[in-house]
From Swiss-Prot:
GO terms for molecular function: ribosomal small subunit binding. It is found in: Cytoplasm. NCBIfam families: rbfA (TIGR00082). Belongs to the RbfA family. SUPFAM superfamilies: Ribosome-binding factor A, RbfA. This is Ribosome-binding factor A. Keywords: Cytoplasm, Ribosome biogenesis. Monomer. Binds 30S ribosomal subunits, but not 50S ribosomal subunits or 70S ribosomes.
Amino acid sequence: MKRQRARRLGELLKKEISDIILREVKDPRIGFISVTDVEVSNDLRHAKVFVSVYGDEKERKETMEGLEKATGYIRKLIGERVKVYYTPEILFRYDDSLEHGARINELLKKVKEEEESDREEG
């Protein structure tokens, strides 16, 4: 039961945090990002927010710094929007799974091209 509540709260937080970052946070360091997942602890007191950042390493670093600075403000707005007994502490984490997936796809594509090339030669 607790796990289900944590999962539901995570989905709600994902939606609300995405909206807050898009519409409310005005920090110029925060670039184009996507909230990919939110993991809420079973006691509902902590939330890890995973974000994917579009851009180079410098832009990613600046975006993560901007998010860290805006964490208190984001948490305050979450407290106003989401009716829970305790507003979870928010911790932002960079999610590189999209980049990792793109890299794997690129490698698979390269292997396939090499196999086709070998078949044509042989």
